[in-house]
Amino acid sequence: MAKSEGRKSASQDTSENGMENPGLELMEVGNLEQGKTLEEVTQGHSLKDGLGHSSLWRRILQPFTKARSFYQRHAGLFKKILLGLLCLAYAAYLLAACILNFRRALALFVITCLVIFILACHFLKKFFAKKSIRCLKPLKNTRLRLWLKRVFMGAAVVGLILWLALDTAQRPEQLISFAGICMFILILFACSKHHSAVSWRTVFWGLGLQFVFGILVIRTEPGFNAFQWLGDQIQIFLAYTVEGSSFVFGDTLVQSVFAFQSLPIIIFFGCVMSILYYLGLVQWVIQKIAWFLQITMGTTAAETLAVAGNIFVGMTEAPLLIRPYLADMTLSEIHAVMTGGFATIAGTVLGAFISFGIDASSLISASVMAAPCALALSKLVYPEVEESKFKSKEGVKLPRGEERNILEAASNGATDAIALVANVAANLIAFLAVLAFINSTLSWLGEMVDIHGLTFQVICSYVLRPMVFMMGVQWADCPLVAEIVGVKFFINEFVAYQQLSQYKNKRLSGVEEWINGEKQWISVKAEIIATFSLCGFANLTSIGITLGGLTSMVPQRKSDLCKLVVRALFTGACVSFISACMAGILYVPRGAETDCVSFLNTNFTNRTYETYVCCRELFQSTLLNGTNMPSFSGPWQDKESSLRNLAKCCDLYTSTVCA
C-alpha cells in the first residue's frame, strides 16, 4: 500500500514537472525505492566527475606549481641574478659608448656616476652609519671640540690671507670686490636686530661655504668645465620646448615673438620639475643639501630645508615644504625663510633667463652659492634669541606629491606652470609700461630745467654706481650695470635680465663699444658680476607675493610677517650683491687670446666680438706719418695684409686712422 502511494506521488510530481519520459520515471521510482532522493543521486555523480577533473588538472599543473613554489623560495636570488645581468649589459654598453666616442657619451657617463654615488651613499648610511657615530664620539668632548674649532678657524684665516696675497698680487683689482664684501657685512651688522646674539659661526661658515663653492665652479678648471657642460646640457634640454611651441604656435611666432619663444620654456620646465618631485629626486637633493648646511652652520631643520628648497622652487612654493611647521617657527627662522626666497630664483624661471641668452653656468652657480649666504646673512641681521622646536633634523619631514602616477605629475606640473606664465607675462607688460611712463615723466620734468635725457635708469646709474664699483665692476661699465641693478630692485628681475641680454647681444654681434659718447655694452667680467647680482627675487614687487603666500599658510602670524618682510628683502638683496663680489674676486679671463693677424686674414664680412677686438688692435697699431701710406707697429709690422685688413676694418668701424 505504501509502495503504491509512493508510485502515485512520484508520478504526480513528475507530471507536474512536465517529465513524460517513461524511462526516467522508472529510474526515479527505483531510486526512490532504495530511499534516495533525486538531488542526492545528482550530487553523487557530480562529485565523482568533479574529483576526476580536479585530479586531472592537478596532474597537468603539477610542474607549473612546483616551478612557482621554487621561484617563491628563491625569489631574492633570481632578482639578484637578473639585476646583475642587467648591470653587466649596461656596463658593457657604457664601456662601448665611451670607447667609441667619450665626448659623445659624457652625459651618460656623468648620469651613471651620479646614480652610483647616490646608491653608495645609501649603502654607507645603511650599513656604516652606527659605526661612524661611534667613531665620532670622541669629538663630543667639549675641550677637544674647542681646540679643533680654534685650529680649523686659524687655518682657514691663514689660508684666506695667503690666498688673497698671492692671487691679488697678479690682479690687484680683485681687492675691491673683497672690500665690497666687508662693506656689506658691516652694513648688515649695523642693521642687526640683536647685535650681541649674532652667531659668528653661522656667518663665517655660510660665507666660507659660498667662497669654497665659488672657487670650485669659477676658478678651478674641472669645476668650471663641469658647470659649463651642465649649462650647455640644460640649454640643449630646454631647446626641446621649440618642438611643442612650434606645433602649437607655428615656427614664425616662436622664432620672432618673446611670448611664444621664452614663456613656453617655463611650462616645459615646470612639467619636468613636477616629474622629478613625484619621483622623489627633488626632495632627496634638498634633504642632502639641508643636512650639510645644518651640520656645518648650526641652523635649525625647518629653516634650512626651506632655504635649500629655494634653489629648486620659488619663493611661495618653498614654504610649502615646511607648511606644518610655520606656525611654531621663531621670528628668526621665519626671517631666514623669507630671506632665502628673496635671495634665490626658482628652477622654473631659470629656463626663461637662459632663453634670454644669460650664461647658464653663472645662473646655476649663483643659485647654489646663494643658499649658505642667505642663511648666514639672515642670522647676522636677525639672530636667534628664542628656543626653536626644530633643532633636530628628524623633526621635519618633506611631503611627497599627491599624484598617483608619473603622467598625472607631468600634467599637473604643466597645468600649474600656466599661472606662472600668465604672471610673468602680465608683470612684464605692466612694469615695462610703468617704466616707460616713469621715464617719460622724468624726461618731461628734466627738460623744464634744461636737463635732457633724464630717466629712471640714469638716476640709478648715478646713485648705485659706487656700490656696483665695490662689487668689482670697472668704472667705465658701472653706469650700465648700476642701471640694470636698479631696474631689478625697483621693477623686476625679468626686465633687468632682458636689458642685460641686450648688452650681451650687442657685444657678441660686434657693435662698437662707444657710439656718440654712450657705452653700448659691458665687458665679460661685468656681465658675470651683473648675472650674480640679479640672481634673486629681491625687488619691491616681491613683497606682496611673499606676504600673500605666507599669510595664506599661517594667517595667525600676519603681523610677524609684515614686521619682517622689509628687513628680509634688503637682506636677500645683499645676498645677491655679496655673491657678485665673490664672482668679482674669483673671476679670471678664460680662453686663448685671439691671434688677430691670422683672424683678420680670413674673409670676414660679419661683425662679431672677435672682429671688433682685432680691428681695435689694428687701429691702435696704425701710425699716420702725414702720408697716404700708414705704417704699422707690433704684430702688424711688415705684414703685407695689414693695409688690406685696415681697409676692411674701416668699412665696419669708425676710427681716426680711417679718415
Swiss-Prot record:
Residue span of region Disordered: 1-22
What reaction does this enzyme carry out catalytically? adenosine(out) + Na(+)(out) = adenosine(in) + Na(+)(in); inosine(out) + Na(+)(out) = inosine(in) + Na(+)(in); guanosine(out) + Na(+)(out) = guanosine(in) + Na(+)(in); uridine(out) + Na(+)(out) = uridine(in) + Na(+)(in)
List, alphabetically, the InterPro entries matched. Answer: C_nuclsd_transpt, C_nuclsd_transpt_met_bac, CNT_C_dom, CNT_N_dom, Gate_dom
Instruction: Please provide one cellular component term from the Gene Ontology annotations of this protein.
Output: brush border membrane
Residue ranges with Basic and acidic residues bias: 1-10
MF terms (GO), sorted A to Z? neurotransmitter transmembrane transporter activity; nucleoside transmembrane transporter activity; nucleoside:sodium symporter activity; purine nucleobase transmembrane transporter activity; purine nucleoside transmembrane transporter activity; pyrimidine- and adenosine-specific:sodium symporter activity; uridine transmembrane transporter activity
**What's one GO BP annotation on this UniProt entry?**
purine nucleobase transmembrane transport
The record's subcellular location field reads: Membrane; Apicolateral cell membrane
Keywords for the protein's UniProt record, in alphabetical order:
Cell membrane, Membrane, Phosphoprotein, Transmembrane, Transmembrane helix, Transport
Q: In which tissues is it expressed?
A: Expressed in liver (in bile canalicular membrane vesicles (CMV) but not in sinusoidal vesicles), jejunum, spleen and heart. Also expressed in brain and skeletal muscle. Not expressed in kidney, muscle and lung.
Which cystines does this chain contain?
none
Task: Enumerate the transmembrane spans.
Answer: 81-101, 105-124, 149-167, 173-193, 201-221, 234-254, 261-281, 296-315, 337-356, 363-382, 424-444, 455-475, 530-550, 568-588
Please give the chief subcellular localization of this protein: membrane
How does the record classify its membrane topology? Answer: Multi-pass membrane protein
For this protein, the record's NCBIfam families field holds: nupC
Function of the protein: Sodium-dependent and purine-selective. Exhibits the transport characteristics of the nucleoside transport system cif or N1 subtype (N1/cif) (selective for purine nucleosides and uridine). Accepts purine, analogs of purine nucleosides and uridine, and exhibits high affinity for adenosine. May contribute to regulate the transport of organic compounds in testes across the blood-testis-barrier.
Q: What is this protein called?
A: Sodium/nucleoside cotransporter 2
Instruction: State the organism of origin.
Output: Rattus norvegicus
Gene name as annotated: Slc28a2
